[in-house]
Regions:
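Short, linear, compositionally biased motifs with a strong N-terminal bias
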Residues: 19-22
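Sec/Tat signal peptide C-region and signal peptidase I cleavage site
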Residues: 25-29
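Bacterial N-terminal signal peptides that target proteins for export
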Residues: 3-16
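A general boundary/transition motif marking the beginning of the first structured unit of a protein
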Residues: 1-4, 227
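Active-site-adjacent core segments of small-molecule enzymes
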Residues: 30-329
Length: 329
């Protein structure tokens, strides 16, 4: 575990170092400046002087072990080596925010994965929202500034909401969050990439797609009556109870855009029917404590055959992860 922690911490620091020395091809200096500013907002919102090394976002969470089992008849159509065989998977379930005492009655559910193949790995960071609140750095910074101003008492919740309603990305995200159920378990939420990745097909062409991990048991929400009967900490116990009976399973599913879908727009829900391709099953079979809470799940760590999104926010988010990771070492 200590060696794994060192490896993934070092990955984050290498990304940060590469930025500082300008060796990442095509990276603009303003992208790094934006990432630094956003990281600063996260620390203003969530820092704890008594625990300066804590994870600054998605602080409340726990770890699990599992495996990816490929759908052989499907993955043979892709030139992505890591998908061709079973892989061990490290899993982290969490809530957004920086407070370990946060109530499980919030709507957010998050899933981070480290899939380890024979010669390479794949890391993912997802939430149960299908979209992000921003499509570019300016929107990201504006959203975070409103959060900070609200915390500092400079604006009210109502004022912040009115300002957010004026920006399409913020309004879309608020609508998406409003539509989410409060699930009784992490096992009852679907988790989404938000970004559109490129997946190399056996033909050599790349298929553009978002991806989701969809629970085989279905997405389920709590009724008002059920919610009233629960305390603020029920997700971990619900997970332990469920996984003790049988593995928790998710379909690893590609969602292929239609002809007119805007693949670079991370704040736009793809409504209606889409081609869906189930690559295989994520089978989560064991609770594994809290050791992974200190690790970094870096979505820019991609395997052979998977191309990074070509949008205006993926690189920025990865840099924010790297910067906040380096700050808490």
């Amino acid at each position: 575990m200590q060696q794994q922690f060192f490896n993934f911490t070092w990955n984050g620091l290498k990304v940060l170092g590469a930025v500082l020395f300008g060796v990442i091809s095509g990276l603009r200096a303003d992208v790094y400046d934006d990432a630094q500013e956003i990281a600063g907002y996260f620390y203003t919102l969530n820092a704890d002087k008594a625990n300066p090394h804590k994870k600054i976002n998605h602080t409340k969470g726990f770890c699990a072990n599992g495996e990816f089992i490929p759908n052989k008849e499907v993955v043979k159509n892709f030139d992505i080596p890591i998908l061709q065989n079973k892989s061990k998977v490290k899993v982290r379930f969490s809530l957004a925010g920086g407070d370990t005492r946060q109530s499980d009655k919030s709507k957010n559910r998050s899933l981070a994965l480290k899939m380890q193949g024979k010669n390479e790995g794949w890391e993912m960071a997802m939430t149960n929202a299908r979209i992000n609140f921003a499509t570019n750095a300016n929107e990201f910074k504006q959203f975070m500034r409103l959060q900070v101003q609200q915390k500092e008492g400079k604006i009210t919740q109502d004022s912040a909401n009115k300002q957010k309603a004026k920006t399409r990305s913020f309004a879309n995200f608020a609508k998406e969050i409003q539509s989410l159920p409060i699930t009784p378990s992490f096992a009852n939420a679907a988790y989404h990439s938000v970004h559109t990745f490129g997946f190399k097909q056996a033909s050599g062409d790349f298929l553009l797609a978002r991806f989701s991990f969809v629970p085989k048991s279905g997405v389920k929400g709590l009724s008002s009556e059920e919610l009233e009967g629960l305390g603020d900490d029920f997700l971990e116990s619900a997970f332990k109870k469920a996984v003790a009976k049988s593995p928790i399973e998710f379909d690893f599913t590609l969602i292929v855009p239609n002809k007119n879908d805007k693949v670079k727009d991370t704040a736009l829900v793809w409504e209606g029917q889409r081609q869906e391709i189930v690559l295989g099953t994520l089978k989560v079979n064991k609770f594994d404590g809290y050791g992974c809470n200190s690790e970094v799940f870096m979505p820019s760590n991609l395997p052979q055959g998977v191309e990074a999104p070509n949008d205006d926010i993926f690189e920025l988010r990865s840099l924010v992860y790297a910067i906040t990771s380096s700050k808490r070492q």
